[in-house]
Amino acid sequence: MDENKKRALSAALSQIEKQFGKGSVMRMGDRVIEAVEVIPTGSLMLDIALGIGGLPKGRVVEIYGPESSGKTTLTLQAIAECQKLGGTAAFIDAEHALDPIYAAKLGVNVDDLLLSQPDTGEQALEIADMLVRSSSVDIVVIDSVAALTPKAEIEGEMGDQLPGLQARLMSQALRKLTGNIKRSNTLVVFINQLRMKIGVMMPGQSPEVTTGGNALKFYASVRLDIRRIGAIKKGDEIIGNQTKIKVVKNKLAPPFKQVITEILYGEGISREGELIDMGVEAKLVDKAGAWYSYGDERIGQGKDNARGYLRDNPQVAIKLEAELREKFQPAEAPREAGETESE
């Protein structure tokens, strides 16, 4: 590219960033766009794929996928990580389906978790807004957008046609919420479901659509698509799901990265399984036939035994994780001269 074009592009990029904010346009090769506070997801693979080490605070995040794909599990693990760091978490259970026993198994301190089971969509979003405005809650999870039923629909008859009511509710709520979220530096996670568009027959066009209109797609800084792609077996018994998570949108680092991880029943995302898979990829763990070795030590025949070894020897798992983080996680981008900590 000649110098005139370079200067013109540089001026255009700086004008775009000035007008629309940092991260609104980026080169795909850029590793880290801005240093931002994050809450780890509980999945090392996903933290690295997100490019910033977790879910960004002060932003809206949408997690969507088919039923039983691991959406709520992922958010509960993020809540557990937030609590480990001394943060406060709130769960707005519009589906009225949260299982506190399962949440506790994933590491959530259910005694300290703020829980709301609202009657209407307006009530749910108003509670979320009040928690955000308090500036004392680190993460608010809303489960799910599909269950945010407008008051008019609840008070109406069963067969009433009320088109676009939920989409208008979401659009209005997000307009109100986003400024408060940024000011309070709270992470707000919306869980969403998928529906099928009727009559979509165009090649290459997906018939799947998320509920609640288009507003959330625009306001979300990060969108994650999570899907079950297979079963994990121990002999003939199915002990978990193999899950693919794709970063569909990311305003803070290059998007479209995807990871394949394991969600074990009653345990959540398998930290040890991820360490083994990433260790093999990074050539830190050697796989010869069915045997896995780390350093000079054999850690197990078959992945399940290797996973058990790391679980029984946490110091080995911590050492391997530290090496993997050093290898995979990008270092913080150096600040330019004159750039201040707070924008």
Swiss-Prot record:
This is Protein RecA. It is found in: Cytoplasm. InterPro entries: AAA+_ATPase, DNA_recomb/repair_RecA, DNA_recomb/repair_RecA_CS, P-loop_NTPase, RecA-like_C, RecA-like_N, RecA_ATP-bd, RecA_C_sf. PANTHER family: MITOCHONDRIAL DNA REPAIR PROTEIN RECA HOMOLOG-RELATED, RECA. Can catalyze the hydrolysis of ATP in the presence of single-stranded DNA, the ATP-dependent uptake of single-stranded DNA by duplex DNA, and the ATP-dependent hybridization of homologous single-stranded DNAs. It interacts with LexA causing its activation and leading to its autocatalytic cleavage. PROSITE patterns: RECA_1, RECA_2, RECA_3. It holds the Pfam family RecA. ATP binds at residues 65-72. SMART domains: AAA. One of its GO terms (biological process) is DNA recombination. Belongs to the RecA family. Keywords: ATP-binding, Cytoplasm, DNA damage, DNA recombination, DNA repair, DNA-binding, Nucleotide-binding, SOS response. One of its GO terms (cellular component) is cytoplasm. NCBIfam families: tigrfam_recA (TIGR02012). It comes from Xanthomonas campestris pv. campestris (strain ATCC 33913 / DSM 3586 / NCPPB 528 / LMG 568 / P 25). One of its GO terms (molecular function) is single-stranded DNA binding.
